[in-house]
A protein has these predicted regions:
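N-terminal, charge-rich interaction modules
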Residues: 1-10
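Serine/threonine-rich low-complexity intrinsically disordered regions
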Residues: 2, 124, 150, 213-216, ...
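Active-site and donor-binding regions of nucleotide-sugar-utilizing enzymes
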Residues: 9, 13, 17-209
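Conserved donor-binding/catalytic core segment of Leloir-type glycosyltransferases
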Residues: 44-52, 220-232
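ALDH superfamily catalytic-core signature
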Residues: 204-223, 232
Length: 232
């Protein structure tokens, strides 16, 4: 894991634009947490971590519900990717948006010393060993949402037993499909529940609030079929 972070730093040194943003943002992450801590008045922190934009959309329905039902908690939203951070750094339903400090044992320990994190939510594929172990040591209830597991993943290979143990650090794992749940239970991970892809919850809410768009209605008028393509 440390090798991966050194490669990122090397890429930043050679001028890779995204790597430079990532390294610069993560270098300031701990200081940003300390500064924010002074404004939280000791309120418990609910930490949600998403890798990038897509994972944020999976966390979004949960954030909206938590913001509504638990207003006394401070919500921290972290990103690994610069694209996620840049797009959502002013997201109004959380109290703080920050980069995830590089996942080293030292940073994980410092983050949990700085912030009174009461609950942590990781999205889909976020399995940072240093953070998961630190959260477990602190007794923080940690959840994984919108996860998908497949037989070829490291957890289920003969040399991946250490990573399989990481899954036991989660209090509950919410997966997208029955196949993922069965695979986990086959390997002794029983705290699992099929909950689907949380992005659909947001899509349903958007559909309920949809407004008529005359330009679109005019475009599709009389058509038997309409094909909509995105990110092509």
């Amino acid at each position: 894991m440390n090798l991966y972070f050194w490669i990122l730093r090397l890429a930043a040194w050679f001028g890779h634009r995204k790597a430079k943003k990532l390294v610069a943002g993560q270098a300031m992450a701990i200081a940003a947490m300390q500064e924010w801590r002074a404004t939280t008045m000791g309120a418990p922190v609910l930490w949600i971590h998403a890798a990038s934009v897509g994972e944020f959309e999976q966390a979004r329905p949960i954030i909206e519900r938590l913001h509504q039902e638990l207003p006394f908690r401070k919500i921290l939203l972290t990103f690994f990717s610069p694209s996620g951070y840049e797009l959502r750094k002013d997201y109004p339903l959380v109290d703080k948006v920050a980069y995830l400090p590089f996942a080293t044992k030292r940073n994980a320990k410092r983050l949990l010393e700085i912030l009174p994190i009461q609950t942590a939510v990781m999205v889909k594929y976020e399995f940072w060993p240093a953070y998961l172990k630190a959260l477990e040591d602190k007794g923080v209830a940690t959840y994984l949402i919108s996860a998908i597991f497949r037989p070829g993943q490291l957890f289920f290979l003969p040399w991946g037993k250490g990573y399989l143990k990481l899954l036991h650090t989660f209090k509950r794992i919410f997966v997208q499909d029955q196949a993922s749940a069965q695979l986990l239970m086959k390997h002794g991970v029983s705290q699992v529940e099929v909950a689907g892809d949380t992005r659909f919850d947001h899509v349903v809410e958007v559909r309920k609030q949809a407004k008529d768009l005359p330009i679109v209605e005019g475009f599709v008028a009389g058509a038997e079929r309409v094909i909509v393509a995105g990110s092509t």
